[in-house]
From Swiss-Prot:
CDD domains: GATase1_GMP_Synthase (cd01742). Keywords: ATP-binding, Glutamine amidotransferase, GMP biosynthesis, Ligase, Nucleotide-binding, Purine biosynthesis. SUPFAM superfamilies: Class I glutamine amidotransferase-like. Gene3D superfamilies: 3.40.50.880. It catalyses: XMP + L-glutamine + ATP + H2O = GMP + L-glutamate + AMP + diphosphate + 2 H(+). It comes from Sulfurisphaera tokodaii (strain DSM 16993 / JCM 10545 / NBRC 100140 / 7). Residues 2-188 form the Glutamine amidotransferase type-1 domain. The keyword ATP-binding applies. It is an enzyme of class 6 (ligase). PROSITE patterns: GATASE_TYPE_1 (PS51273). This is GMP synthase [glutamine-hydrolyzing] subunit A.
Length: 188
């Protein structure tokens, strides 16, 4: 299986690739300046984190909007990637009332495909000042934290997932399970 990891300059993106390679997968970092057509050869797409805000800096994120709208592969958004999917697909993203940094208790409300094996809660690594406050139409909320209502979301077809936390950071409990679950979803 070949997975594109969209690299927005986030400090943890290389850890996503490392985790996927550990699972025996072919994972490649791709910068968003590449044309959308390059993604046709990949089985799934992961949108990593980064320093941008989808509220004010979508124009600095290359072809990210096209990557979301013009591809049909299963997608996972992590942190900024989660916010990108929400914003581009019609959800609402705002500045966080209380930004989250470090370990945060994430409550699993719906142990759907992406969060299988993680309930009732995990301690997860967070690093964000923006947050999804309303998922796109047809999505449901899978997890929340004390300060963020939408810690994880999924569309009705179980093909587009978003997590606000960083499963790739070793401090996140059972983070590798998120990737295993996403790979299973990609196979369907």
């Amino acid at each position: 299986m070949k997975i594109a990891v969209i690299y927005f300059g986030g400090q943890y993106n290389h850890l996503i690739v490392k985790d996927l390679k550990y699972l025996g997968l072919n994972a490649v970092l791709i910068t968003p300046e590449k044309p959308v057509e390059i993604l046709k050869d990949y089985d799934c797409i992961i949108f990593g984190g980064g320093p941008y805000s989808v509220i004010t800096e979508l124009n600095k994120m290359g072809n990210a909007v096209d990557y979301v709208l013009r591809t049909s592969q299963p997608k996972l958004g992590i942190c900024l990637g989660h916010q990108l999917l929400a914003k581009v697909l019609g959800g609402e993203v705002t500045k966080a009332t209380k930004p989250e940094y470090g370990l945060v208790k994430v409550n699993i409300n719906d142990e759907d495909t992406i969060l299988r094996g993680l309930s009732p809660s995990i301690n997860a690594w967070e690093s964000h000042t923006d947050e999804v406050i309303s998922p796109p139409q047809g999505f449901r909320i899978l997890a929340n934290s004390e300060n963020a209502k939408v810690q994880a979301m999924v569309n009705k077809d179980n093909t587009i997932f978003g997590v606000q936390f960083h499963p790739e950071v070793k401090h996140t409990e059972k983070g590798i399970e998120v990737f295993k679950n996403f790979i299973e979803a990609c196979k369907k």
